[in-house]
Amino acid sequence: MGKAELLKVPLFRRFFQRMNIPVNRKSNMDSHRAFKRAGNDIDKGISIALFPEGTIHHNAPLMGRFKNGPFRLAIEKQVPIVPITFLNNWLLLPDDFHKRIGHPGIARVIIHDPIPTKGLSEGDIEKLKADVYAAIKKPLRKKFPEYYSKE
């Protein structure tokens, strides 16, 4: 899933149309439809990728608050969440990357162990969010202690 504005970016449009579920973030109805489509894809055995912040955080590498939707969906479908830490995307992709191309370089990615949701219910969303947040944050804190020392 990703913001519908990416359909306007020539470089991403073709890839995005085939691989993503566009979401108009200004429309609650559109967000609901996107999560329904994501749920249908999960039912078909298709893996989906969701960024739980719902946006690129402007104080990267600090992380923003996670939204409930991805966790609610994972619990509803009883599928594991595989947290992924993108260590340096914020250096390669500028905030306005939809207007210009990013910087050359190698994206550093850490794929964490899956976090199961079997047996969890909606009452477990906050704990699940905290567990995923901690998994993603740990390598960021290690790599960029100057950003996380004030926490």
Labelled PLM ranges:
Residues 33-151:
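Non-catalytic C-terminal accessory region of glycerolipid acyltransferases
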